[in-house]
């Protein structure tokens, strides 16, 4: 049975994804938590990990086949504007360690959730082809948007190694 790990398993997205795969019974499901206590689900093996610590990232990814990266430092849109460094620094560190460790541990699949923070405000739905990296993102989201783009490019970088 393939081993699937969901980082950020106690967050909104991570919990829903973990519960879905736990019901499927096709995978041995692992989930990380840090500040939020794990919820009750006997089909998920919970692992406490500080994902800003490289050694702990390596430990939870060892021996896994599939990674779903749903972990992040999040505090809300107010902090994105008033204290943007919180999201930029922690999430850049977390995702850099996660992507490197996934590569070094030879995980077969990595799923990384992105968002639309890097797009300019618009009255029409945006597509990936609408992103112009020559233009700065919306002023209030400058740091978080460029961090997200950096991590997307980090995923692409590691995907190029065979």
Question: What are these language model-derived features?
Answer:
Residues 4-24:
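N-terminal Rossmann NAD(P)H-binding glycine-rich loop of SDR-like oxidoreductase domains
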Residues 26-35:
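Conserved glycine-rich Rossmann-like NAD(P)H-binding loop of the short-chain dehydrogenase/reductase
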Residues 36-43:
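Short loop/helix-cap segments at secondary-structure boundaries that form the rim of catalytic
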Residues 43-53:
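Rossmann-fold cofactor-recognition segment
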Residues 51-90, 104:
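NAD(P)H-binding glycine-rich loop region in Rossmannoid oxidoreductase-like domains
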Residues 69, 96-141:
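Conserved Rossmann-fold NAD(P)-dependent oxidoreductase catalytic core, especially the SDR/UDP-sugar
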Residues 82-97, 105, 142, 146-147:
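Glycine-rich NAD(P)-binding loop of the Rossmann-fold in SDR/ketoreductase-type enzymes
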Residues 139-162:
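Active-site Tyr-X1-5-Lys
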